[in-house]
C-alpha cells in the first residue's frame, strides 16, 4: 500500500515540479532491474540534472518521504511487494566529459547515470587505457563506484580520483581519492550520501591494444557467464582465495530451480530469470545456496546483490 503522503494531490504536484523528467506512480520495478523481478514503487522520479536531484532530495527530506536511489538496476533484487516511498532513478544524469591534465593523464568525469559501457566505448574511441576491466559490467557509474566494482584484478579504487556526492546535509560535496576508503566490493560512504559524479584518471594508449583487450574480456565473459538470460550479476562476494561460483558448484546446486528462477548451469554464482521469475523465488535460492555452502564447507557467503523492498 502506498504511503499516505503520496496520495496527496499537492505532494504529487510538488514532486512533478522538482524535475523535468518522468514522475510515475505505482510503477512496476521489474522493468528497471536487470533481474527482471520486483513489485511497484509508490513513485518513480527521474531527475535530469544534478540541480534537479538536489531539489528533489531536499523536498523528500523536508516531507519525510523515504527514498531509494536506482542506477542501472544491476546487483539489485526488488522484492515482490515493491518499494514504499520514492525511487529516484539516476539514469537521467548522463553528462560525460574528458580533458588532459598537466601530468599527461586524461581526466574523465561521468555523472552517476552514465553506463559503464558508454565509458568503455569512449576509451576505444579516444584511445584511453585503464578502464578495460569494466568491459561487460552492466552497471552505471554511481553504483559501480559505491560497490567498488572490479574484475580481472582491477577495481574502481584504482582509477577513481574524486567523487561528488549529495551529502547528508543536502549539499554537493567533492571528495578526493585520499578522502575515500575502499574495501572489497564496497566504498565506505554514508548510506545517506548519493554519488552524483565521479572522476577517473586514465592514460593515453594504443587504440588497437585497448580494443583487443576489450574484445578478449567480452569473449571471456560470454564464455563463462549466462548472458542470454536476465540476471543480477554475481550473487555473492568471493571469499578470500575461493571463488563463490566454485563453492556453489561443489554443492551440486547448479541447475536448481524455484519457479522461473534458476541457479545458472553455466556459472554457479549467477541466478537467472527464465521468463517469469518472482523475487521470492530468487531470494529462496539465495538462502538455499548460503545454507548449503555453510553446511558443506563451513563458509558463510556474503551477498553482493542488495535486496530491497517488501514481500508480496
Curated annotation (Swiss-Prot):
It comes from the Bacteria. The active site is at residues 185, 234, 304. It is an enzyme of class 1 (oxidoreductase). Pathway: Cell wall biogenesis; peptidoglycan biosynthesis. Keywords: Cell cycle, Cell division, Cell shape, Cell wall biogenesis/degradation, Cytoplasm, FAD, Flavoprotein, NADP, Oxidoreductase, Peptidoglycan synthesis. One of its GO terms (biological process) is cell wall organization. GO terms for cellular component: cytosol. It catalyses: UDP-N-acetyl-alpha-D-muramate + NADP(+) = UDP-N-acetyl-3-O-(1-carboxyvinyl)-alpha-D-glucosamine + NADPH + H(+). HAMAP family: MurB. This is UDP-N-acetylenolpyruvoylglucosamine reductase. It comes from Syntrophus aciditrophicus (strain SB).
Amino acid at each position: 500500500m502506498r504511503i499516505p503522503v503520496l496520495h496527496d494531490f499537492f505532494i504529487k504536484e510538488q514532486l512533478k515540479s522538482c524535475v523535468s523528467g518522468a514522475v510515475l506512480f505505482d510503477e512496476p520495478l521489474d522493468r528497471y532491474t536487470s533481474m527482471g523481478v520486483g513489485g511497484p514503487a509508490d513513485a518513480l522520479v527521474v531527475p535530469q540534472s544534478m540541480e534537479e536531484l538536489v531539489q528533489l532530495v531536499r523536498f523528500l527530506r523536508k516531507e519525510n518521504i523515504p527514498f531509494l536511489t536506482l542506477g542501472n538496476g544491476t546487483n539489485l533484487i526488488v522484492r515482490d511487494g515493491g518499494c514504499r516511498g520514492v525511487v529516484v532513478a539516476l539514469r537521467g544524469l548522463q553528462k560525460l566529459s574528458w580533458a588532459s591534465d598537466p601530468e599527461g593523464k586524461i581526466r574523465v568525469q561521468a555523472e552517476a547515470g552514465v553506463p559503464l559501457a558508454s565509458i568503455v566505448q569512449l576509451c576505444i574511441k579516444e584511445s584511453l587505457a585503464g578502464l578495460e576491466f569494466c568491459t561487460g559490467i552492466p552497471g552505471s557509474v554511481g553504483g559501480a563506484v559505491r560497490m567498488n566494482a572490479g574484475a580481472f584484478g582491477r577495481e574502481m579504487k584504482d582509477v577513481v580520483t574524486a567523487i561528488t556526492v549529495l551529502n547528508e546535509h543536502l549539499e554537493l560535496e567533492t571528495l578526493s581519492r585520499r578522502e575515500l576508503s575502499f574495501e572489497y566490493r564496497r566504498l565506505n560512504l554514508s548510506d545517506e550520501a548519493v554519488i552524483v559524479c565521479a572522476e577517473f584518471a586514465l592514460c593515453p594508449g594504443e587504440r588497437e591494444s585497448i580494443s583487443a583487450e576489450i574484445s578478449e574480456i567480452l569473449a571471456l565473459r560470454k564464455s563463462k557467464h549466462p548472458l542470454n538470460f536476465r540476471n543480477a550479476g554475481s550473487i555473492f562476494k568471493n571469499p578470500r582465495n575461493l571463488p563463490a561460483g566454485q563453492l556453489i558448484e561443489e554443492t551440486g546446486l547448479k541447475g536448481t530451480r524455484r519457479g522461473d528462477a534458476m541457479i545458472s548451469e553455466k556459472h554457479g554464482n549467477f541466478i537467472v530469470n527464465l521468463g517469469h521469475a518472482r523475487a521470492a523465488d530468487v531470494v529462496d535460492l539465495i538462502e538455499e545456496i548460503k545454507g548449503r555452502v555453510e553446511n558443506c564447507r563451513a563458509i558463510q557467503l556474503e551477498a553482493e546483490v542488495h535486496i530491497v523492498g517488501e514481500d508480496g
